[in-house]
Structures are given as structure tokens and as C-alpha cells.
Amino acid sequence: MKKGKDAEQDFLNWLDENKFSYLYINQDTESFPKLFTNQVKRPDFLLLIDSIGLIAIDIKNYNIFKDKHLSLNYESEFKKTLAFERLFRLPVWYVYKNNDEWLWISALKAIEVAEMKINSGTNEQFLSLNIDDFTIVKSNSDIG
């Protein structure tokens, strides 16, 4: 949990340094309607990008495994994020912290390029994402 919060704070600082317009979304359970509990995962940020428009951002801070892959839990993360995208008609992007850069991938691209795997410890499905399928962003000049 702390690792995720640290990444959110780092991303918030990065947004400020790069002069982006954004909203940081409160993650308290009281701030989200009970109707959506356990069905929708809200993003961490809403980000306004001049060349694209408004997008939702979900920050991740996971370790790269086998030097090339990042994971995303299918049930608790991906399906609930896609429900948010569908309900609010707002594209969701996953942004993974990777040292001094950010790896970006849209939720729709993630499902297209990922390999579905099973976690041997939990028996849960997850998406295995190759880092080559991400867009690397170090500054706002790397975005459209």
C-alpha cells in the first residue's frame, strides 16, 4: 500500500513539475457511491492533455519481472477499471512507475497485447504486460 501511495505522490509531483492540469481523486470509501462498491475501481487522477482531452490515470508501482514484464490483476484491477471506463465513458490509462520514467498503456491496449496468466500462489488470473508495449514518458514533451 505504501509503495502505491509513494508512486501516486511521485506522479503528482511530476504532474506539477510538467505543468499538467489534473484532479487527484480521493480514494476514501466514503467518497464513492455504495452502488459502485466492488464493481468499479476508480482511477487515481483525471488528467487533461491538450492533444487528447480528459483521461483517467491509475498509478501502479509494481516490480518488473523477468526483466520485461509487468502484471495487472484481472479481476480486482482490470475488470473493475474497465467498468469505470464504460460507465463514465472516459479512457483509462495505467501508468507504472519505473525509476525516473513512467510507463503508460491504455486499458484497451493492455487487454489486446497482454498474455493471460495464473498466479501460482493465489490461483488468480493476471495480465502479463511486456514493457515494449508501453509508451515511455519522462516529460510532458513525450506526450502528443
What residue ranges belong to the model's regions?
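Acidic-basic catalytic patches of nuclease active cores, encompassing PD-(D/E)XK
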Residues: 1-34
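Conserved catalytic cores of phosphodiester-cleaving nucleases, focusing on short active-site segments
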Residues: 15, 43-66
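A structural signal for short, well-ordered beta-strand segments and their strand-loop junctions
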Residues: 23-24, 56-58, 92-96
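Active-site metal-binding core of divalent-cation-utilizing nuclease and nuclease-like domains
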Residues: 24-52
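Mg2+/Mn2+-dependent nuclease catalytic core
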Residues: 62-84
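Nucleic-acid nuclease catalytic cores
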Residues: 82-110
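Intrinsically disordered, low-complexity terminal regions enriched in charged/polar residues
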Residues: 103-144
